[in-house]
Amino acid sequence: KDATQGWDQGKDLVESFIPQWKHEQYSIYYFNTDKWLQALEKADMYDWKGAMDIWFDFLDSNDPLKRSCASFNIATACYMSGDYPLALEWLDQSDKINKLQISSVLRKRINARK
């Protein structure tokens, strides 16, 4: 209860300064290996650069699904960092390799912010 109350108070405070604040959920693809989980942990802490540094390593993978997922995650990181044109480039790259099921959701979000 205290955590929820604190969240609500914090949200109210932020909204008083930034009325356009919008709560969004995002999706990150990962595989059950140490490096993927490290990147997921960094993304969960909003360390987008740290997460991207790990995902970049997967861009040379022989597995097209892993390359596509890494590109999608980089697109998400760019989107969350406010670089919408770069996010779109990475999402296009991901779609060229292997269009992921939730790609269209991220594309709509990016296009709404351009």
Please state what every model-predicted region is.
Residues 1-70, 74, 78-81, 92-103, ...:
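C-terminal/domain-edge helix-coil "capping" segments
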